[in-house]
């Protein structure tokens, strides 16, 4: 805006200068015409010194005017250049402003992108920290599980060490003349079921005792099955159909146990059913139990406690179910006590299992939510390396598990062989009892002491055999229970291993996700660094442009200051020149006024001279006439003229007076001509240029008239003389 104002002011000054120059040109043209007029007037006459001075002054004024015109042209050129430069600077300013706006927008957009990247990086760092915490927690859990596995292996080794001396102790006891009460163990969903053995010492027992044994066995099996089923993970189906089926199976078990105790036959079908049930239970557990790794600590501890309680309760039940049947009243009271204690344990176990169930459900929900959250993140990861690691670890684990399974199968085969040997011993004892029972009955008929002694001896042997059989059966039961516990432990360990594998896969997926996020973060950091580099470059460019703008602004300011100084100098010079020209114009105007006064005075003098000469001529003529009239000759002449003309003398005088009137009219005409000449000269002086030639003609004509009048005057003077 300042440049535009200055340009407007310069334009105004230019217009003012142009008007002044035009006025000066007009004045100079008028002066030239006057000088030409004077030059034509004074042609042939000697020139005087003041005319030379006027010509020199006029030439100087012309030179100055030409210089002023040249300066004005240079000023116009400079003003045009300044206008062009100002336009260029305006364009550059607009261009720089557009660049500044563009760079500002870019900087703002990049600032926003940087903020977004910083937010993303902060969120990624938070995710990293959270995942690191989770990884540390999972590593801790893995270490705890490994410790538990090591403890389980140590316990298994200890159990093997304990079982081996018991086998060594029981091997030399080869007493084939004893009666045994067999026990059947049924495991549903990895459960242990104990039964009490009942030995027949006499063949002639009543049916009421058999029914009593049925009821007691069914009740004890039902209680122990509830205990063992509820000691699991708490995922049993508590429907009515299942309860009815369980009661039926328990009744069938009781009948089977009694029949086997009566018939003394090995039960192989039950073992097969047990294996099928165990496989089905393991499959159901693998399908149902999908727990998270974080919530496994409490259930594992509770499982340990329940397993210990289970083993203790089973041992107690075994020790309590295998006393010597001396008093039947004790055998009747023991199941009632067991049932009451079992109900209390069941209630406590139900409460704890409900709590565990709620905790596990919450954990399951949390695990499902976390799984849903991490599903999308676990897809885009480095699979090959992790799959190879997973295969390697799984191969190692499978090798270890296969070795453990082979050892356990060997132990199981050994135990089955022991069971078969014990079953053979029981069969022999039954045959002996069958053979000895009629002998005892027959010998009772004969009242002989020898037979009584033999019977007593045999009874003592039978008691010893039964005691040994009970010991062996208890040892077999304990071994079977240990086998079942080991199987359960192996299944639990397999489940734990599967869970650990799942956890490891999840952790690997998380690690892959973290690696992917790290890559994204590295890429984002690289892009961020690139953006920073570009921003720095653009900042440098901006600084350069700003410096250029500052330089241009300073140059513009310098140009403005120089232009203003030049304009001020030009204005001062123009003012000085104008003052000089005004002074010269005043002098020229004064000279023109003096010239007009001179012309008017000259014209007046010429007119007055002509008028004087005319009057003098008239006076001379009148004097001449008066002189002739005084003479007689004139009188005679008049009379002769009157006689010749046949006119009276009065008429002749009138005619002579008419001549005078003609002269008066001539004088009037001359006066009018003089007035017209004066008016013509005034019109020429006041009229337009050029008028020098016309004025010269008029003045020369007047001078010629004056010359003629002077010549007439001299002729009249000569005549008079």
Curated annotation (Swiss-Prot):
Residues 52-164, 345-515, 573-626 form a coiled coil. One of its GO terms (molecular function) is protein kinase binding. GO terms for biological process: centriole-centriole cohesion; protein localization; protein localization to organelle; protein-containing complex assembly; regulation of protein localization; single fertilization; spermatogenesis. The modification Phosphothreonine is found at residue 658. Residues 156-180, 259-288 are annotated as: Disordered. Keywords: Coiled coil, Cytoplasm, Cytoskeleton, Phosphoprotein. Residues 165-178, 267-284 have a biased composition (Basic and acidic residues). Phosphorylated directly or indirectly by NEK2. Its main location: cytoplasm. GO terms for cellular component: centriole; cytoplasm; sperm head-tail coupling apparatus. It is found in: Cytoplasm, Cytoskeleton, Microtubule organizing center, Centrosome, Centriole. The keyword Coiled coil applies. Required for centrosome cohesion and recruitment of CEP68 to centrosomes. Interacts with CEP250 and CEP68. Interacts with NEK2; the interaction leads to phosphorylation of CNTLN. This is Centlein. It comes from Rattus norvegicus. The gene is Cntln.
């Amino acid at each position: 805006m300042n440049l535009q104002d200055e340009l407007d002011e310069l334009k105004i000054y230019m217009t003012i200068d142009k008007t002044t120059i035009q006025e000066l040109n007009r004045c100079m043209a008028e002066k030239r015409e006057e000088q030409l007029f004077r030059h034509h007037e004074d042609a042939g006459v000697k020139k005087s010194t003041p005319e030379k001075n006027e010509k020199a002054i006029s030439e100087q004024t012309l030179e100055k005017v030409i210089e002023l015109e040249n300066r004005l042209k240079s000023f116009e050129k400079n003003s045009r250049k300044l206008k062009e430069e100002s336009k260029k600077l305006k364009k550059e300013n607009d261009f720089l402003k557009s660049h500044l706006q563009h760079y500002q927008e870019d900087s703002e957009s990049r600032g926003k992108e940087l903020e977004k990247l910083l937010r993303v990086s902060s969120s990624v760092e938070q995710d990293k920290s959270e995942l690191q915490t989770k990884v540390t927690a999972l590593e801790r859990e893995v270490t705890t599980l490994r410790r538990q596995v090591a403890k389980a292996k140590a316990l298994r080794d200890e159990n093997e060490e304990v079982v081996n001396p018991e086998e060594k102790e029981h091997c030399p006891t080869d007493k084939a003349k004893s009666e045994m009460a067999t026990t059947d163990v049924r495991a549903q969903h990895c459960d242990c079921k104990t039964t009490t053995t009942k030995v027949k010492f006499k063949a002639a027992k009543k049916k009421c005792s058999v029914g009593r044994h049925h009821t007691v066995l069914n009740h004890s099996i039902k209680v122990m099955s509830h205990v063992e089923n509820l000691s699991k993970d708490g995922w049993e189906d508590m429907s009515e159909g299942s309860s009815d089926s369980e009661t039926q199976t328990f009744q069938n078990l009781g009948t089977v146990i009694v029949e086997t105790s009566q018939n003394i036959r090995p039960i192989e079908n039950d073992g097969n059913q047990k294996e099928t049930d165990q496989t089905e239970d393991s499959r159901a557990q693998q399908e149902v139990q999908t727990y998270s790794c974080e919530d496994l600590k409490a259930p594992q501890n509770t499982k340990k406690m329940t397993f210990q309680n289970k083993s203790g309760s089973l041992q107690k039940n075994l020790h309590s179910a295998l006393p010597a049947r001396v008093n039947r009243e004790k055998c009747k009271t023991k199941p009632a006590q067991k049932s009451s204690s079992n109900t209390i344990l069941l209630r406590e176990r139900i409460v704890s299992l409900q709590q565990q169930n709620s905790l596990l459900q919450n954990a399951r929900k949390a695990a499902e939510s976390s799984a849903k959250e991490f599903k999308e993140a676990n897809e885009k990861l480095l699979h090959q390396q992790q799959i190879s690691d997973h295969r390697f670890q799984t191969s190692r684990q499978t090798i270890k598990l296969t070795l453990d399974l082979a050892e356990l199968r060997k132990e199981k085969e050994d135990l089955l062989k022991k069971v078969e040997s014990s079953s053979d011993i029981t069969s022999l004892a039954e045959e002996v009892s069958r053979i000895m029972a009629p002998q005892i009955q027959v010998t009772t008929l004969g009242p002989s002491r020898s037979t009584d002694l033999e019977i007593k001896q045999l009874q003592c042997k039978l008691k010893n055999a039964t005691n040994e059989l009970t010991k062996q059966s208890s040892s077999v039961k304990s071994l079977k229970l240990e086998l079942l516990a080991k199987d359960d432990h192996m299944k639990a360990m397999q489940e734990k291993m599967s869970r650990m594998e799942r956890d490891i896969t999840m952790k690997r997926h998380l690690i892959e996700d973290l690696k992917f996020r790290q890559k994204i973060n590295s890429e984002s950091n690289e892009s961020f660094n690139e953006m920073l580099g570009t921003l720095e470059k653009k900042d440098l460019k901006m600084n350069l442009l700003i410096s250029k703008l500052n330089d241009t602004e300073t140059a513009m300011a310098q140009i403005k200051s120089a232009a203003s100084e030049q304009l001020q100098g030009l204005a001062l010079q123009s003012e000085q020149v104008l003052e000089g020209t005004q002074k010269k114009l005043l002098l020229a105007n004064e000279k023109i006024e003096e010239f007009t006064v001179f012309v008017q005075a000259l014209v007046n003098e010429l007119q007055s001279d002509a008028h004087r000469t005319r009057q003098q001529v008239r006076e001379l003529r009148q004097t001449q006439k008066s002189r002739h009239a005084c003479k007689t000759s004139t009188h005679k002449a008049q009379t002769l003229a009157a006689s010749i003309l046949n006119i009276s003398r009065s008429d002749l005088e009138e005619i002579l007076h008419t001549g005078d009137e003609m002269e008066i009219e001539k004088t009037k005409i001359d006066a009018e001509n003089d007035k017209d000449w004066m008016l013509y000269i005034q019109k020429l002086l006041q009229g337009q240029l050029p008028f020098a030639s016309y004025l010269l003609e008029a003045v020369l004509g007047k001078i010629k008239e004056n010359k003629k009048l002077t010549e007439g005057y001299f002729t009249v003077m000569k005549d008079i003389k």
